[in-house]
Every structure is written in C-alpha cells, then in structure tokens.
C-alpha cells in the first residue's frame, strides 16, 4: 500500500476538503493540535491525488491494522535498528498503519486513528505503547484533528496546548 504525506499543502482549503470528501477512505486533511498549528495531507493508495502535489513524501506500508477512521490522528516518526521495525509492527493495535520511507532508509511513520482524545490518552499510557516507544530510535510525535470543515482552521479557534478543560 502506497502512502504519501504532503507537508503544508499549498492548495486552497476548499480544494483540500473537496479532495477529502471525494475520497474519504484515502485522503485525510490533518490539522495539528498544538501551538505549532499547521496542516498536512495524508494520502493512502490514491496516486491520482498525489499527482496534484509538488512535494509528497512517499512511504510503503509495512503493517496495517483496522480501519482508517477517527477524529484524532496520532503520528509517530521514528528510526529503527536491526529488526525492531518488525517487533513494533507486531505491537500495533486499534486502527493504525506503519510505513517505511521510500528512500530505503530505516525511517518509519505510524499513523493511528482514534475517535476521541481520551482513547488516545489511554493508549499513550498503556504498556504496549511503552514497549513500542522503547524499540524506537528518535521518536517524534504529532497529534492532529481530522479537518472536515474550514471553521476548524480559524485563527479564532483556541489553541489547546494549555487548555485544562480540553486535556483534563
């Protein structure tokens, strides 16, 4: 399965939302949930969509679990040595995809899909996640909301980094 990640797409928001609504199982418009607000586009097995972008980052799937649906998408970028990538793939749970960068190096991404922030928080506190994290070299995480409406990208939307009501 071919996966592409487009960082900070240059197309208008309306065009990105249309691409997503036309192919909801393949295109995910992602809005970062942090002060470093920005958007990315995750494209799964839709080369016709990838062709519309100048700088997609290509990946090949190594493990696929469940379905790609949810309001919260958690991304982990990491490197792996030896056969740690295979061990990490065996620990995947829920709705997730693990992919290796097309450049042939030991650079990987995991995208996991969650209905709520509470579900993601439970996973991040789990023993399985701790085991996965211990096998990763230089892990870097980003959490996104699944953007379905232009209003989610408004500058008037409250940043949630320090919102105790949001994070609990």
Regions from the language model: what does each represent?
Residues 1-97, 101-104, 121-122, 139-168:
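Short S/T/G/P-rich N-terminal loop/turn motif that feeds into the first structured element of a domain
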Residues 125:
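Helical (often loop-to-helix) elements that flank the catalytic cores of nucleotide-handling enzymes
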Residues 105-109:
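Short, surface-exposed coil-to-beta transition loops
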Residues 79, 111-113:
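Short hydrophobic/aromatic beta-strand micro-patches
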Residues 129-134:
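A common structural junction motif
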Residues 115-117:
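Short loop-to-helix capping motifs
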């Amino acid at each position: 399965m071919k996966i592409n990640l487009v960082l900070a797409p240059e197309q208008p928001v309306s065009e990105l939302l249309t691409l997503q609504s036309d192919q909801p199982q393949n295109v995910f418009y992602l809005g970062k949930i942090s002060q470093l607000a920005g958007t990315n586009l995750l494209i799964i097995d839709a080369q016709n969509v990838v062709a519309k972008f100048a700088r997609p980052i290509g990946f090949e799937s190594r493990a696929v679990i469940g379905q790609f649906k949810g309001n919260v998408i958690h991304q982990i970028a990491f490197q792996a040595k030896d056969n740690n990538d295979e061990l990490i793939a065996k620990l995947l749970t829920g709705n997730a995809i693990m992919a290796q960068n097309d450049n042939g190096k030991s650079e990987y991404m995991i995208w996991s899909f969650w209905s709520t922030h509470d579900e993601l928080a439970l996973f991040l506190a789990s023993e399985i996640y701790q085991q996965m994290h211990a096998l990763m070299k230089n892990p870097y995480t980003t959490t996104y909301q699944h953007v379905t409406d232009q209003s989610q990208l408004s500058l008037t939307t409250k940043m949630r980094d320090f919102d105790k009501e949001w994070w609990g």
